[in-house]
Design a protein with these regions (language model features):
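Glycine-rich, basic loop-to-helix element that forms the pyrophosphate-binding segment
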Residues: 1-16, 37
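Conserved nucleotide-sugar donor-binding
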Residues: 17-18, 98-109
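Short aromatic/hydrophobic "clamp" motif used to bind/position activated sugar donors
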Residues: 21
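The conserved acidic donor/metal-binding loop of glycosyltransferases
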Residues: 25-29
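Conserved donor NDP-sugar-binding/catalytic core segment of glycosyltransferases
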Residues: 33-66, 70, 142
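Catalytic donor/gating beta->alpha subdomain of glycosyltransferases that bind UDP-sugars
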Residues: 42, 58, 113-176
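Short, flexible, basic/aromatic active-site loop/helix in glycosyltransferases
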Residues: 52-54, 58, 68-92, 96-98, ...
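Membrane-embedded multi-pass helical conduit in multi-pass membrane proteins
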Residues: 186-221
Length: 221
C-alpha cells in the first residue's frame, strides 16, 4: 500500500538534510540550469514554492500525438493552466509542475497526503496557499514535457486525476480551483441542454447557437 507517489515523496523529504526540496517527475527533459535558477528565485522572491513552464512535445510523429500535444498546451484545451499555456513574466499562481520548495514548508503545513495517489501536489499547493504561502511560476526555465500519444492514454490519465479531485476538495473543504468545474459543466450542458430544448423549443436556438460558436472556436484555435 505504500508503493505510491505520496509515500515515496514523504520518505524522501523526511530523509533530506538540505534547505530545498525539489521534485522531478518523468516524461520530461530538464534544462541544465533547472536547479540553479529555481533555487535562486526561491530565495530571491521569498517564495515557498517555485516552478517552470512546460514545452509540450508530441510523443511521436503521428497526427494524433501532435494533436494531443497542441491541445495540451493551448488555452482552448487546458484553460488557465499557466505553466502549460505559457507566460512571459514571473507570476504568482496556484500551482506549478513538480515544484522547488523550501524545506521548512513541510514543517509548517505537513507532508503530502498519502490518501491521494493522484493530485497530491494540487492538494498540497492549495493547502500551502491557504496557509499564506507563496507559489511562483518562472518563465525563464522551460521543461520539455512529452505528452501521451493516444486518446486512450490521455483518457486514462485524466480519469485518474478526476477520480481524486472530489477527495482533494473534501480534504480542503473547498474546491482547489474553479476551473476544474468547466469541463463538467460543459459536458452536462451538452447532454441536458439538448434534452431540455426538446420540451422548451425556444431554448433550442440558444443550444444550437452555443454548439455552433464552440465549433467555430474549435476551428479557429
Amino acid at each position: 500500500p505504500e508503493k505510491v507517489v505520496p509515500y515515496a515523496l514523504n520518505y524522501g523529504i523526511k530523509a533530506s538534510k538540505g534547505d530545498v526540496i525539489m521534485r522531478l517527475d518523468g516524461h520530461c527533459v530538464y534544462p541544465n540550469n533547472y536547479i540553479s535558477v529555481l533555487v535562486n528565485y526561491l530565495f530571491e522572491l521569498s517564495a515557498d514554492n517555485v516552478g517552470a513552464l512546460w514545452n509540450t512535445l508530441p510523443a511521436n510523429d503521428s497526427l494524433m500525438a501532435n494533436a494531443i500535444a497542441i491541445g495540451s498546451s493551448h488555452k482552448f484545451g487546458v484553460g488557465g493552466s499557466l505553466h502549460k499555456v505559457g507566460i512571459t513574466q514571473v507570476t504568482e499562481t496556484d500551482t506549478v509542475p513538480f515544484g522547488c520548495y523550501r524545506r521548512d514548508v513541510f514543517d509548517r503545513i505537513g507532508m503530502f497526503d498519502t490518501d491521494l495517489i493522484r493530485n497530491q501536489d494540487d492538494e498540497f499547493n492549495a493547502r500551502l496557499i491557504n496557509a499564506g504561502g507563496k507559489i511562483v511560476l518562472i518563465p525563464e526555465v522551460v521543461i520539455d514535457y512529452t505528452a501521451r500519444d493516444t486518446i486512450s492514454k490521455m483518457a486514462r490519465m485524466y480519469y485518474q486525476y478526476g477520480l481524486f479531485k472530489p477527495l482533494v476538495n473534501k480534504k480542503l473543504g473547498a474546491p482547489a480551483t474553479i476551473r476544474q468545474f468547466f469541463p463538467l459543466l460543459f459536458v452536462l450542458g451538452i447532454l441536458f441542454g439538448g434534452l431540455v430544448s426538446v420540451f422548451f423549443p425556444i431554448l433550442w436556438y440558444a443550444y444550437v447557437s452555443v454548439l455552433f460558436v464552440y465549433l467555430l472556436l474549435s476551428l479557429y484555435f
